[in-house]
């Protein structure tokens, strides 16, 4: 189950990077819903970045706030949240 979620997240991130935001966001969301991810906070960070890139600041901020833990993803998420709140 976890590998499927990770594969969905990885594919979603690649699609977002290629400019296919809608499909990439859908796969990132689906991968997070499946659960069992190796690095769920990193996936939430990527989802927040994708939302921000698509212009959805509110969902981006929610995704950044959902990043928990004690690694660098949390610090990055806080910085991205500050960036997302700029007018």
Protein language model regions, located:
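Structural marker of alpha-solenoid helical repeat scaffolds
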Residues: 34-36, 69-70
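Generic helix N-cap/helix-start motif at coil->alpha-helix transitions
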Residues: 2-9, 38-44, 72-76
């Amino acid at each position: 189950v976890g590998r499927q979620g990770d594969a969905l997240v990885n594919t979603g991130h690649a699609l977002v990077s290629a400019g296919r935001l809608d499909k990439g966001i859908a796969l990132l969301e689906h991968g997070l819903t499946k659960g069992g991810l190796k690095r769920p906070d990193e996936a939430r960070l990527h989802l927040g970045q994708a939302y921000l890139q698509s212009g959805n600041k509110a969902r981006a901020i929610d995704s950044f706030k959902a990043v928990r833990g004690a690694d660098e993803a949390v610090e990055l998420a806080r910085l991205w949240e500050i960036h997302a709140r700029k007018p």
